[in-house]
Amino acid sequence: RNNEPIIIKNDEFRKCILFISFPIYDYKEEELKILKDVIFDRSEKYDTKRKLAIACINNYCLSYRSKISFIGNNAFLEFALIYPSVASLKKDVLQDNLLFAREMIFNPYLENGVFSEKLVRESIEMYKEGVKNKLKRYDGYCQYKNDLLIDENDYLVSKVFKDLSLLSNVTSERLYNVYKKIISGPPLTFLIGNVDEKKSKELVKEIILDNKISNVKFETDYNVYVKNISNSVEVVRENSEFSTSSVCCNYKVRDMCCYRDRVLLTIVKNLLSSNNSDVLF
C-alpha cells in the first residue's frame, strides 16, 4: 500500500491519537530494544528532560511514546502521540503536535554525530533490570517458562530476553546507523479522533511525510504465531523458590491466519479472564 495518511474521524473522542510507523526490513533485535528508548528520551532542540517536559506542556501533548511492534513477520518502529481534540480544548493544536513529533523523530539528541553513549548505556541497563525484575516475580517467571514451551521461533520470547549478553554488541554508532536506515523510508501514518479530515491529511503530508507519497511493502502472515498442533497433552512441573504457585495452560488455535481471527481471539481471551496479559493458544 502507499503511505497516504489515514484519518479516522470519530466525534466521540475527546483525545486525538497520532501513530507514525516505520517498517523495518533488516534488523538485529538487540538494537531495536534499545533504539526505541534512546530516540524519544530527548532531541536536538529539547536536549534536557526539563526542556522536553516544558515542550509537552506548551503543545498540550498529553503523552508520547516509541516502541517496536512485531506483526506477523514484520517489524515496525512506532511513534504515538496523544493530544486533546478541538472540541475538548477549544483550540486546534494538531500542527503544534505534528511539529513536536517531527522534532523528536527526525532530530534526535546526538553527541559527536551519534547517539549519546551515556543514554545508550542507561537504556541497556534499564532493559536488563526489567528482565531481572520480571523473572523475580512468580507470575513473570511462570509466563516466561510457559512461552518458552510453545515458542520455537522467538515470536513470544525475544532472543535478547533469553540472552542478555547480546546487548554487549550494541554501540551508539551502530544504533545511529540503524536509526538512519529505518527513518529513510516512508512511514505509515494514522490520525484518530475528532479532527478536520481534509486539513489533518494535508498537515500530516506536509510536516511528517514532506509531501512524499510512496509505496510501503510488508507481508501479513499470522501462521508464525502458532506452533504445530499436537495430539498429546504435555505437562511441565517445576519446583522453585517462590512461595506462591502459578499455573499456565496453553490451548492451540487451529488455522488462525487472518486478522479477523486474532480480533475474535482477543475477545474470547477477555471473556475467559480478567487479566488482559493472558494469551490463549
Region locations from a protein language model:
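M16 family metallopeptidases and their MPP-like homologs
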Residues: 13-32, 37, 49-103, 132, ...
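Extracytoplasmic/secreted envelope proteins and their assembly/folding machinery
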Residues: 32, 49, 53-56, 98, ...
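Acidic/histidine-enriched alpha-helical segments
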Residues: 49-54, 100, 107-132, 216-227
